[in-house]
């Protein structure tokens, strides 16, 4: 164990910290002194300039004989100042350089002394007076801002000191508690050893006395041992508590340390530069530039003998640069302005853990804190960005005021024959008192507002810097703690490339494809800003020619991808909407009729190049598709226009930004809504078009699955019905890898396991079943079976719609009246329907032939047997006797009153039986192979299947009867999902869909309720009603998939034998 003498003591650590803080405090004081000194030099320089021009004006009146004397006077003074402070030419500040060249030029001045004298007295000197006043005033305010920032920095350092002291205190308590715990353990060992020795040394006594003594000694020893154990437990709890406090204190210390270093770095690198550049020097160089340019304008009208010297001064004036002067100043006083060394973590008493502890029990706290920091940072960045924009606009206004080009005095030399004309000209220009008073008042008011926003911006940036440093450290630590050693293999997917890849840029096509697949229902898409780091990474990848969004991975932030798409259009050198058509497009917005507006917009846009129109057509088709999910993503066409308008169409300069932006938003909204009427169709303009099916193109991996034709995809009803039909057909799959579910809804399975897939929950998840348990299955861990009969055939949407509109041609009636069917009857029905199913590959024709409207008791009983066929086959070793069926028949048939079995046709159950791959999953591989390859079936196998089917059906009916009167219990699936937005809404379970959906869509009946506990027992009969009008399946995140949210159905017509009414407030599934 390391000796404590080697560790730094608390006093040593605090002393080192105090020393470092004192050095920083002294450095901050020297910074203010340095800035004060620069202000004094500046004021002195401006005062010298005023004196210079005043004296020069007087000398001009006495001709040029006195100019040499004046020049020598100031040249001598300048030489002495330069020798003392500026020994090297490269360290001379630009204003001082101009001053030196100006003095050298004075010797040349000998003509036009009267005009120059008037200009000096009435124009240039007042300018320097204003510059001096402005410089002093601005420096005072700059000093206040700098002092505030220094106070904030010292406050951060004091907070770090407090956190460090807290860390020392808790760590010392932890060490003390540990030592006390060890002492208690030693006492316990000592007591146990002492007890053993006393028993060994005990001398023999009389029986009675010996027994009494032993009892007393045992009682004393037990009492002592219990006391020691209790003390040990208390000290153990105290040590655990103190250790946890020490860990939290160390984490807090590390976070504060990171935030302090970031604040110090930000102050020295950014804040000082901004204070000098944007506060102290605000308008100084520009005003000085104007004054000297006034002088230059007068001097350039002199004789050619002056040009050589004046060119040198002009060059120096052109080089008046605040940035260069700031750099020279910092180089001259490098020790004052250089950032100090970073604060390093000081381990206390051997605590060498210099990283955040992200393990339990502080991990959840750190995760929550990281999320809170991220939310807070998002808000602060938006607010600070708005303040920055306001500050920059105000700064531009001030720069416009101080850079007014009013230094030209060439009019004063327009062949004036008298001094009166010159004086009148001068007085009418710069020194007009009403004009200058108004200008000065406006400038001071703008400056006050600017400094208010500047202070607010710097304080906000300071807070963001601290929070960002903490957030980054937390995120880095949490990311490393959750990283696993082995990565799971992922299914590789091929990226489809368009034939005309040059027509749509890769970044546009890839971002839109990704959002169409994963982000149509992402709330706040294009409105919420994403991570700037991820936006830059994705942008850089596209610039390298890569496609970072290719494949099925969904590990990108949706807001960042949306930001990349907006950034691309905002950064185009030639925007999609050129400025030369801006007025024509805005004129279209004034039309009230939406159709007429679309026609006029089309006429204006048709003049654009074809590649631009192709991109516009592709983009706005996507935005229209996105707006159809406004209930989920909260982005209707108007919101999309607000977010996308500034990126696509900028307001030209010289226009009112606020009013014009409102027109631009209305224009983009109109194009989104009327994009089909505005842009040419593919026949008129060849090129790639946005396909709404793109988001669904990778949902099925089966090579036998049929794809929807382009002609059918344009019909909403057909596409929606086709989607509903696909969801009703289970698919068999094989696990590629082992998978362990992370939540209660995720299924766990081993490599090679057979899985049953019901429907797609998202791009990354399936709803399915394994080992009789329903749940979610990851898509990238499975392979869909590709056998001749392994993929359920799908009927075309057109044929199914026709079948829905036609009356039923055949009806299957029950063979018995009020009694339940026998086992032989069930076998006949089962075999007959298997043969019909084989002969009719079109599911639509099967549905047409076997639609049943029998709702009497007889059909209910017959359907109860069909229910068993559609349910999961449960093997049973006990045969079902025929004499038992009539006995149980009345009980089973009575369930139809509230179980709604009368609404299930034979065809529905039998078709579901045939569609389900569970029919192929029998006891031996030979049976499954015979079903898949359509080989002759073994009679023994058929008998076993029929026996298992009837047994399963009767067991399920008994379970249904038992639970029909039971109290409703919470549904495991429904109660764990998020609350649905619309009410009433039927939540889907993880059971396979059945053709009952199609029948209910055709013949709507009131929804019956069931106990939620039967969801795992009745496999196919009880399914939630699916609405005909479905937008698209929900695309949830990969970490926790969410079920599809269906809109409210309109099935209100009562059934034949039903008397119950649907209850909207109940969360139970309905039939």
Curated annotation (Swiss-Prot):
Modified sites of kind Symmetric dimethylarginine: 927
Null allele phenotype: Mice are viable and show no abnormality of cortical lamination. However, a delay in dendritic spine maturation coupled to an increase in spine neck and spine density is observed.
Site annotation Arginine finger: residues: 527
Region (Disordered): 181-211, 700-726, 795-819, 838-918, 984-1012, 1029-1071
Highest taxon of the lineage: Eukaryota
Ranges of biased composition (kind: Low complexity): 855-868
GO cellular component, as recorded: cytosol; dendritic spine; dendritic spine head; glutamatergic synapse; lamellipodium; mitochondrial inner membrane; nucleus; phagocytic vesicle
SUPFAM superfamilies reported for this sequence: BAR/IMD domain-like, GTPase activation domain, GAP, SH3-domain
Residues annotated as domain F-BAR: 22-325
GO BP terms in the entry: actin filament severing; dendritic spine development; excitatory synapse assembly; extension of a leading process involved in cell motility in cerebral cortex radial glia guided migration; filopodium assembly; inhibitory synapse assembly; lamellipodium assembly involved in ameboidal cell migration; negative regulation of neuron migration
UniProt cross-references to Pfam families, sorted A to Z: FCH, RhoGAP, SH3_1
Subcellular location per the Swiss-Prot or TrEMBL entry: Cell membrane; Cell projection, Dendritic spine; Postsynaptic density; Postsynaptic cell membrane
Keyword Glycoprotein listed: no
Residue numbers carrying Phosphoserine: 206, 427, 500, 691, 695, 724, 795, 916, 930, 990, 994, 1013, 1027
Ranges of residues in domain Rho-GAP: 489-679
Biased composition (Basic and acidic residues): 181-203
Modification after translation: Methylation at Arg-927 is required for the stimulation of cell migration, dimerization and localization at the plasma membrane protrusions.
Keywords: Cell membrane, Cell projection, Coiled coil, Cytoplasm, Cytoplasmic vesicle, GTPase activation, Membrane, Methylation, Neurogenesis, Nucleus, Phosphoprotein, Postsynaptic cell membrane, SH3 domain, Synapse
Coiled-coil zones: 363-401, 940-968
Subunit description: Homodimer. Forms a heterooligomer with SRGAP1 and SRGAP3 through its F-BAR domain. Interacts (via SH3 domain) with GPHN. Interacts (via SH3 domain) with FMNL1 (activated by RAC1); regulates the actin filament severing activity of FMNL1 and actin dynamics. Interacts (via SH3 domain) with FMNL3. Interacts with RAC1; specifically stimulates RAC1 GTPase activity. Interacts (via F-BAR domain) with HOMER1. Interacts with ROBO1 and ROBO2. Interacts with FASLG. Interacts with PRMT5.
Domain comment as written in the entry: The F-BAR domain mediates oligomerization, binds membranes, and induces plasma membrane protrusions.
Name used for this protein in its record: SLIT-ROBO Rho GTPase-activating protein 2
Organism for this UniProt entry: Mus musculus (Mouse)
